[in-house]
Structure formats: structure tokens, C-alpha cells
């Protein structure tokens, strides 16, 4: 028995020993095989030496937001005497020791990636990540196509440029491809061969799960073949300049979890009827031309966590079927055309943290359905039509950090419970009708508040002490414009927030410069406009180191305290001093200023040559001062950057200098109301961005500038009250009209000749309907608009902003002859037509009846005959008509707009009559009875008529003499008031101002 036990024991020990030996050998062999092959190591070391180490300042995403990316040089760990399989960013195959993975993302690499790079000797690579480096705009080498085992390729945000080689599409094993960058449409962006690349991509990459080509210039439509990429789980095509209509079927790919089509403004499409069991988690269609409604089938997206459809053209109501999206955390529908009320079913979205429906046409009261969503951190309902009161129970949203209800019609007071939400960092209630300041004193409870916007409401009942905001130590932005403020308790020693960057106190009844501002070292923008501040601008203002935007307009300031040396060396880029009482010579603004507005002051002297030292001015407005002398020729140096030059209403003389050769961005030039002479400079023909040209009320002596019709954006042309001469029709060449002109005022010059019947055929902008409310020269920054003075309805009218819908043709006060062109009838969007004080003949064209938007028609002081076309009686928009002093005959049209006019609108036309004229003008235009036709000859009739006239004159002499003596007595004995009360009619009088 003992022998058997010993034999068994020996047998077991032998087996254990053999197993242990085998395990050790396998482990040793494995360790040996993990070692990096020398050729792999050498290739990597050569690759390391191809680049310099570069430490980036950061990376921006496509929206310009700084990304949370940390970079460090991974290749620093690569040394010749170590195993490359253990280097940072390297993965090796456990059996062969070949390099299969290379992750050098965020590795501070700087230099060109050349086609002969040693990288391409690593033939066994399955994953390559070179994201967040700087390959200095080198093309993506086609040699990547040699990596036939490659499954993942990430070259994002690494400064590649040029055409993407179609050879990359040979990598048919790819499951993830990221070629994105942060700068769409830039010269250095990547691009593809259109349209072949996308077709082959869809056909070759059937296994692809993730595709990101953001900021790659695709500039074509997405082919229907993308719908067959059933393995896709993530598709990101931001900022690719996608065109055409996006295939709905792509949104229905069964396994698709995330799709983003943001920043493709020309991409059209609509949301499909979503199927059940859809896998979508994130749907982002932002800044596109997608339209249509949100379908009720949105409820089938049971797993959706983020829905972003902002800045597109979606419309209709927000569907109540959103209630089914129980996992939704982000809902962004801003900047669309949604209407109606927010559905109560929104209250079911218990996971919602972000809710943004700003810039739509929503209405109703504050959406109470939001008050039950206690996870909400962000609410933006700005720029809608909400009314009523803000809810008193808003404090239920205890996690709220951002709340903005700006630009609505909320009334009443700010709910006191709002000040219990201690997590609030942003509170925006500007541009409403809030009128009760009672609860504003509780604002001090919001210790975390960084942005407070209460401006432009109706807070006028009582003053608010500015010191209630002293406790808000984290404030960065404070806007209180329109709130009457008391600053008596605020001194330079008051401990206001030291973080303040933006301060808006316009229209706050402030009478002196707030002293606390002098300690705001981080302040970059200040608005003290529309107050009653008198005296001088304190010198300490210019010493604020970060100050860049200053608006002091519409006060009573007369000058500056102390030297302006600090101003000239400041960072200020926008300075608005308009509508004050500044006097003396014009000072030199900071060289880096971009917006300098000094209009409506008393600046005198010459425009100093030093103004030509400005680096890149965009807007220069010195209008309505007392400047004289010449316009400096050295301004030519500024024309490459100037967008607006306004020198209106000064005493400038000489000629308008020929300085516009490089004025490629000049959109508005106004030198009206000076004493300029000579001709218009020919260099204006190169101002391809010019929208407004106003040279009114000068002494310019020139012919009509036909060459201006080559300007592609010219919309306003005012040559009024100069010495222009010649014809308005280019008889010596082809006349193309002015396709974009909306306002043309060439009145009170010396234009002659006739206008052909097709004269207005190419005035396209006044022929087509304009539906969108826009302003000509609508600014992107600082709210600067060009104003204009025009004649309308017989009076001078100033427009502070020029609407694109407002259209004018004013040829009055010239010597134009012939017929009014029949083509005037195609100008269906024309609002004002003034052809008065010329020598037009012929008839009033019946085509005027097509001008259904016409408000003012003046053809007085001409030689026009015939009848007023009865069709004009249908022009319901016509408010003011003047056909006086012509040779018109017949009845006036039947229409209330003709019956409302003063008698002066018809005088000087003894041949016109009408039933309504008797009420307006008395018996002089009473309806004429039908005259019987006598059988004798016309000659005898004429002689008889002459005889009857003499008899009537004699018979009327005696009673007429009596009547005249009686009237003389009445008027000279101060009884004319009795006479007018008894027999006369008081009439309104149009006042002409200029």
C-alpha cells in the first residue's frame, strides 16, 4: 500500500513539474515576443525626429468655444534603449510584437507630415490617432491607404489642408474615421473631389460606425447611398457647406445614435416620420435651412437625450407628443418660426436640464409646465410674444442657473421668490414691460449672480438706489438702462464687484459721472448714453486698462478734463460722443479705434490729417458739426477698412477727392449738405460693397453717373439739390437700369430730355415683393444705422433707419419732358413717386394702377393732359395725391383716397370735376351737367358762344360790383372770421420743413 502511495505521489509531482515548466516557457516566450521589433522602433524614432515640440494655446470647436484638451509631448518617453511597446501612445500585438496602435493625439507635434514619413513603414497599424497637433497645413498623405488593416483613423484638428485623396477610400476595414477641423470655409480647410468621393465613401465603408468630417469643404449634396450605411452609429457633418436636400432616409438608419448637421446654411430638408424602436440619442440640426414641422412621430425616439433644431426654418406648433421623450435632457428650438403656446405636456420631461425656445413667435402666459421640472438649470424664452406676469412660484426651480425672458411683454414686478434661487448666475429680463421696482432691493440675495439684465422696461415710478447691487461681488455684466437710479450713496470707495466687464446705464437720469467706475479695472464696455451728464469727461476714464467700448452719446458734455494723452494710448475701439455739446478742434482718437461717432456737436476747424493715422477704422461719423475746409486726401489709406463715412451737414468745400480706389468694403458714403463742387470721383465705380450714396445739397456739377449701375449692392442714391445736368437716360449706350436701387432721389437738378417707355424695366428691387423686415446697412456691431431725409406726402421726413421695404423715386424739380414711361407700372413695391415740377406731357399712365403699395403720388406742376385713369381709384394704399397745375380734364376716380385730398391737390386743372370735389373745393369743381349739341355749324356756334360770354359779362358787372364792395367792407372791418365761420370750410395745412 505504501508503495502504491509513493508511486502516485511521484506521478503527481512529475505532472505538476511538467506543467510549471511549460507555463514558464510559454510566459518567457510571450515576454520575448512582446518586445518591439527593431525596425518598428527605428521607424518610430525617425518619426519622432520629423517634428518639433509645440505647445498650443488651446483648441476651439466649430462654435468658437475653447475645448477642454490637455496636450503634452508623448514622444519624450521614446528612447532607443527601451522597448517601444511600452512607449507612451504605442500599442503592440501581444504575439508578434508589431506596432498595431499609434495614439499621438494632443502630443504637441509641429511640422509637415510628408508622404515619405517613416510612419508609413508601420504596416501593421490598426488604429492611428494624430488629433490635436499642428501639421502646418500639409495635405493628408495618400500613403495612409497602405494601412490595409486600419480600423480607426483620427486626423482631426491637426491643421491638415488640401484635397483628401480618394485613395483613402481603399481602407475598407475602417469602423471610425475623423477628419474634422475647427475652421469651416477657410482657405486652409480640407476638401473633397465632388461628387465622386461621397458616393465611393458610402459604397466602400459599409462597416463604418463613426464618421466625422466637420469643416471639410464638401460643397455638394449628400447622396442617397448614405442611407445604405447601416452600420453607422454616429454621423457628424458640421460646417461642410452641404447643399441640396438632405435624404430623410439617412435619419432612419436603424443603428444611428447621433447625427449632427450644424452650420450648413444652404442645406435643406425636413424631419421624417420616425419609426418605432429608433436608436437616436442625439439629433442636432443647427444653423441650416431645414424647414417644416416637428412630426408627432418624434415620440418614437424613446432614447433621445438631446434635441437641437435651432437657427433653422422650422415652423408650426411644438408638438405635445414630446411628452414621450422621458430621457430628454437638452431641448433647443431657438431661432425658428414656431407659433402658439408651449404645450403642457412638456411637464413630463423630468430629466430636462436645458430648455431654449428663444427667438420664435410663441405666445401665451409664462409656460407653467416648466415649473415642475426641478432638474432645469437653463431656461431661455427670449424674443417671443409671452404676456402676463412672471410666476410667483418660480422658486420651485431651485437648481436654475440661467434664466432669460428678455424681449417679451411681461408686466408687473419681478417675483420676490425669484431671489430665493441662490444658484442663479444669469438673470435676463430686459425689453419687457415690467413696471414695479418694489422687489429689486432683494436682488442682493443672489450672491452667485454674474449677469443681470433689467434694461429697457417701464421702471419709471421710483428711483432705485444703485447701492443695492453692491453685494453682488461676482457681477460681470450689469444692464440697468431705463431704470431711474440714485447714485448719491455711491462713491469712488464703494466696493462694487471687481469683476465687472459690461456696464449699461443708459437713460437712468444720471447727472454726473458715477465715481465708482474709476476702480473697475476689468471694465471693457460702458454705456452712459441718454442721461443728463454735464460738464467734462473725467480723465480717469481713459486710464481703465481694459476699456474698449464707450458710449457717452445724448448728454450735455462740453469737453474733456485734462490731457487726452491717456485716451490716445488706450485700447478703445468704439467711442460714441454724438449729440453732446463738445466744442473746439477735433481731437485725435486712439489709433486702434474702429468706430468713432462724433456727430451733432460743435467741433470746428479742419478735419486734422492725423485722422488718417487710424489703423483700421470701420465707421467714421463726423456729421452735423461745424467742420470746414477740404476732405483730406490722405483718407485714401483708411478706405480699405472703412464701412461708413458720414460727413453730412458741415461746411466742407472743394471737390470730393478721388480716394475710393481701394474702398472695397465701403457700404455708406454721405457727404450731403456741404459746399462740395466739381464732379463725382470715378473711383466710386470700384466700391463694390456700396449700398448708400448721398451727395445731396452741394454744388456738384456733373452729368448723371450711369457708371454707378455697375455697383452690385447700391440701394440708395441721393443726388438731390446739386447742379447735375444732361439726361437720365443713357442714349449713347446700353441702359441696364438699377437692379437693386430702392431709393432714388435726383430732384432739384438740371436734368433734361425724355424717358423711354421701358425706362424702369430693370429696376428689379422695386418690382419684387420684399417680405422680410430688414434695414439697409443693418449693422453687425454697435447698432449704427445710416439715416436719410426724403420728401414724402409733401413734407420732409427723416428716417433714422432705412427699411428695405421703403422704396422711393423722386425726379422732381428738373426739366424732364415727354411721357411718363408706361413701364412705371411694373414697380409694384414702389411707395413714393414724385415727378412734380418737370415738363411731362401726355396722359397719366393707367399702369400706375398696378402699384398696389403706392402711398404718395405727386405729378403736379407738369403739362399732363387727359383724364385721371379711373383704375387709380382702386389703389387703397394711396394716402397722398397731388395732380395740381396740369391740363387734366374729366371726373376724378371714385375712391375714398381721392376724396380725402385737399383742394390744393387738384387746383390749376379747371377741366376736372367730381361729386366729392364740391365738398372740398366748393362750386369751382362741381359736377358738370350734360351739354346739348346744337344743330348749326361749329363756326356759328363759336361766334354765338363768344357773344353769350360778352352778354354774361355785362349782365354780371353790376351785381359783381355790389358783391365786391360788400366783401371789401366785410374783410376790412375785421369780420372775416364771421364770414369764414358762415360760408367757409377750415382745411388742414401741410407744413414743409427742410
From Swiss-Prot:
Keyword match Methyltransferase: no
Family: Belongs to the RLP family.
Record Pfam families: LRR_1, LRR_8, LRRNT_2
Cytoplasmic side: 968-994
LRR repeat extents: 122-146, 148-171, 174-199, 205-228, 230-253, 254-278, 280-301, 302-325, 326-349, 350-373, 375-397, 398-421, 423-445, 446-471, 477-497, 498-520, 521-544, 546-569, 571-595, 597-613, 614-637, 639-663, 665-687, 689-710, 711-737, 739-762, 803-827, 828-851, 852-875, 877-900
List of glycosylated residues: 116, 134, 154, 277, 287, 420, 435, 442, 489, 522, 554, 561, 602, 649, 701, 762, 834, 850, 882, 902
Primary localization: membrane
Compartment(s) of residence: Cell membrane
Stated name of the protein: Receptor-like protein 6
Name of the coding gene: RLP6
GO CC annotations on file: plasma membrane
Positions of transmembrane segments: 947-967
PANTHER family xref list: LEUCINE-RICH REPEAT RECEPTOR PROTEIN KINASE EMS1-LIKE-RELATED, LEUCINE-RICH REPEAT-CONTAINING N-TERMINAL PLANT-TYPE DOMAIN-CONTAINING PROTEIN
InterPro entries linked: Leu-rich_rpt, Leu-rich_rpt_typical-subtyp, LRR_dom_sf, LRR_N_plant-typ, RLP23-like
Signal peptide: 1-25
Keyword annotations of the record: Cell membrane, Glycoprotein, Leucine-rich repeat, Membrane, Receptor, Repeat, Signal, Transmembrane, Transmembrane helix
Positions in the Extracellular compartment: 26-946
Classification via SMART domains: LRR_TYP (SM00369)
Membrane protein topology class: Single-pass type I membrane protein
Native species: Arabidopsis thaliana
Amino acid at each position: 500500500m505504501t508503495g502504491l502511495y509513493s508511486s502516485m505521489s511521484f506521478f503527481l509531482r512529475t505532472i505538476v513539474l511538467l506543467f510549471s515548466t511549460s507555463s514558464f516557457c510559454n510566459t518567457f516566450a510571450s515576454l520575448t515576443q512582446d518586445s518591439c521589433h527593431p525596425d518598428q522602433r527605428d521607424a518610430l524614432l525617425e518619426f519622432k525626429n520629423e517634428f518639433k515640440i509645440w505647445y498650443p494655446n488651446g483648441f476651439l470647436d466649430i462654435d468658437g468655444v475653447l475645448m477642454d484638451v490637455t496636450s503634452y509631448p508623448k514622444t519624450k518617453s521614446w528612447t532607443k534603449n527601451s522597448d517601444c511597446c511600452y512607449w507612451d501612445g504605442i500599442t503592440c500585438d501581444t504575439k508578434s510584437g508589431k506596432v498595431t496602435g499609434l495614439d499621438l493625439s494632443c502630443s504637441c507635434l509641429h511640422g509637415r507630415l510628408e508622404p515619405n514619413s517613416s510612419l508609413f513603414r508601420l504596416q501593421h497599424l490598426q488604429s492611428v490617432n494624430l488629433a490635436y497637433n499642428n501639421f502646418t497645413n500639409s495635405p493628408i498623405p495618400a500613403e495612409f491607404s497602405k494601412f490595409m488593416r486600419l480600423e480607426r483613423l483620427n486626423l482631426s484638428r491637426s491643421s491638415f489642408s488640401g484635397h483628401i485623396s480618394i485613395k483613402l477610400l481603399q481602407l475598407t476595414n475602417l469602423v471610425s474615421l475623423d477628419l474634422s477641423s475647427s475652421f469651416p470655409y477657410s482657405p486652409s480647410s480640407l476638401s473633397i473631389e465632388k461628387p465622386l468621393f461621397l458616393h465611393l465613401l458610402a459604397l466602400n465603408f459599409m462597416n463604418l460606425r463613426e464618421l466625422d468630417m466637420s469643416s471639410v469643404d464638401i460643397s455638394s449634396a449628400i447622396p442617397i447611398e448614405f442611407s445604405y450605411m447601416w452600420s453607422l452609429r454616429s454621423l457628424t457633418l458640421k460646417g461642410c457647406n452641404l447643399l441640396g436636400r438632405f435624404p430623410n432616409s439617412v435619419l432612419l438608419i436603424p443603428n444611428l445614435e447621433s447625427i449632427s448637421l450644424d452650420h450648413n446654411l444652404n442645406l435643406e430638408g425636413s424631419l421624417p416620420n420616425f419609426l418605432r424602436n429608433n436608436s437616436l440619442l442625439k439629433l442636432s440640426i443647427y444653423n441650416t435651412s431645414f424647414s417644416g414641422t416637428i412630426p408627432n412621430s418624434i415620440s418614437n425616439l424613446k432614447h433621445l437625450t438631446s434635441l437641437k433644431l435651432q437657427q433653422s426654418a422650422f415652423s408650426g406648433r411644438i408638438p405635445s407628443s414630446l411628452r414621450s421623450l422621458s430621457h430628454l435632457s437638452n431641448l433647443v428650438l431657438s431661432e425658428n418660426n414656431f407659433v402658439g403656446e408651449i404645450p403642457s405636456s412638456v411637464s413630463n420631461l423630468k430629466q430636462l436640464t436645458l430648455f431654449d425656445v428663444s427667438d420664435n413667435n410663441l405666445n401665451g402666459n409664462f409656460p407653467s409646465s416648466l415649473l415642475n421640472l426641478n432638474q432645469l438649470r437653463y431656461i431661455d424664452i427670449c424674443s417671443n410674444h409671452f404676456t402676463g406676469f412672471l410666476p410667483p412660484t418660480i422658486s420651485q426651480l431651485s437648481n436654475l442657473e440661467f434664466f432669460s425672458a428678455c424681449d417679451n411683454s411681461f408686466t408687473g414686478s419681478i417675483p420676490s421668490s425669484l431671489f430665493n434661487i441662490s444658484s442663479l448666475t444669469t438673470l435676463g429680463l430686459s425689453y419687457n414691460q415690467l413696471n414695479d421696482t418694489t422687489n429689486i432691493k432683494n436682488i442682493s440675495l443672489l450672491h452667485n449672480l454674474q449677469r443681470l439684465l433689467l434694461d429697457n422696461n417701464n421702471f419709471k415710478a421710483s428711483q432705485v438706489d444703485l447701492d443695492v447691487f453692491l453685494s453682488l461681488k461676482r457681477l460681470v455684466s450689469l444692464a440697468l438702462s431705463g431704470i431711474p437710479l440714485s447714485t448719491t450713496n455711491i462713491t469712488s470707495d464703494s466696493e462694487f464687484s471687481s469683476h465687472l466687464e459690461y456696464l449699461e446705464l443708459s437713460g437712468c437720469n444720471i447727472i454726473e459721472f458715477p465715481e465708482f467706475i474709476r476702480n473697475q479695472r476689468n471694465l471693457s464696455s460702458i454705456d452712459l448714453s441718454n442721461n443728463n451728464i454735464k460738464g467734462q469727461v473725467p480723465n480717469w476714464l481713459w486710464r481703465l486698462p481694459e476699456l474698449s467700448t464707450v458710449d457717452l452719446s445724448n448728454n450735455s458734455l462740453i469737453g474733456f478734463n485734462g490731457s487726452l494723452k491717456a485716451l490716445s494710448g488706450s485700447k478703445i475701439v468704439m467711442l460714441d460722443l454724438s449729440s453732446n455739446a463738445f466744442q473746439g478742434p477735433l481731437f485725435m482718437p486712439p489709433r486702434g479705434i474702429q468706430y468713432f461717432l462724433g456727430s451733432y456737436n460743435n467741433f470746428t476747424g479742419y478735419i486734422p490729417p492725423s485722422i488718417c493715422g487710424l489703423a483700421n477704422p470701420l465707421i467714421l461719423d463726423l456729421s452735423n458739426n461745424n467742420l470746414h475746409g477740404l476732405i483730406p486726401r490722405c483718407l485714401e489709406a483708411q478706405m480699405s477698412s472703412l464701412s461708413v463715412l458720414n460727413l453730412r451737414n458741415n461746411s466742407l468745400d472743394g471737390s470730393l477727392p478721388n480716394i475710393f480706389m481701394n474702398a472695397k468694403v465701403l457700404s455708406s458714403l454721405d457727404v450731403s449738405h456741404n459746399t462740395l463742387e466739381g464732379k463725382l470721383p470715378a473711383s466710386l465705380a470700384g466700391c463694390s460693397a456700396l449700398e448708400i450714396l448721398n451727395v445731396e445739397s452741394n454744388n456738384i456739377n456733373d452729368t448723371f453717373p450711369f457708371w454707378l449701375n455697375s455697383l452690385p449692392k447700391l440701394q440708395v442714391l441721393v443726388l438731390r439739390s446739386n447742379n447735375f445736368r444732361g439726361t437720365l437716360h443713357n442714349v449713347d449706350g446700353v441702359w441696364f437700369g438699377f437692379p437693386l436701387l430702392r431709393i432714388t432721389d435726383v430732384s432739384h437738378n438740371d436734368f433734361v430730355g425724355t424717358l423711354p417707355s421701358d425706362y424702369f424695366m430693370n429696376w428689379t428691387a422695386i418690382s419684387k415683393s420684399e417680405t422680410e423686415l430688414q434695414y439697409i446697412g443693418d449693422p453687425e456691431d454697435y447698432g449704427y444705422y445710416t439715416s436719410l431725409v426724403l420728401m414724402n406726402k409733401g413734407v420732409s421726413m427723416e428716417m433714422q433707419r432705412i427699411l428695405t421695404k421703403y422704396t422711393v423715386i423722386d425726379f422732381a424739380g428738373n426739366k424732364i419732358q415727354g411721357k411718363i414711361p408706361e413701364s412705371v407700372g411694373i414697380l409694384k413695391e414702389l411707395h413714393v413717386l414724385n415727378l412734380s415740377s418737370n415738363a411731362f406731357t401726355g396722359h397719366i399712365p393707367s399702369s400706375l394702377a398696378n402699384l398696389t403699395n403706392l402711398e404718395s403720388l405727386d405729378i403736379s406742376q407738369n403739362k399732363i393732359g387727359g383724364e385721371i385713369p379711373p383704375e387709380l381709384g382702386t389703389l387703397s394704399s394711396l394716402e397722398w395725391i397731388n395732380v395740381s397745375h396740369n391740363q387734366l380734364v374729366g371726373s376724378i376716380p371714385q375712391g375714398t383716397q381721392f376724396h380725402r385730398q385737399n383742394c390744393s391737390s387738384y387746383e390749376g386743372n379747371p377741366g376736372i370735376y367730381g361729386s366729392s370735389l364740391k365738398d372740398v373745393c366748393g362750386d369751382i369743381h362741381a359736377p358738370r351737367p350734360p351739354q346739348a349739341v346744337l344743330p348749326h355749324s361749329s363756326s356759328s356756334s363759336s361766334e354765338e358762344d363768344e357773344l353769350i360770354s360778352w352778354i354774361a359779362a355785362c349782365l354780371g358787372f353790376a351785381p359783381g360790383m355790389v358783391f365786391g364792395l360788400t366783401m371789401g367792407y366785410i374783410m376790412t372791418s375785421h369780420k372775416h372770421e364771421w364770414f369764414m365761420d358762415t360760408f367757409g370750410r377750415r382745411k388742414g395745412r401741410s407744413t414743409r420743413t427742410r
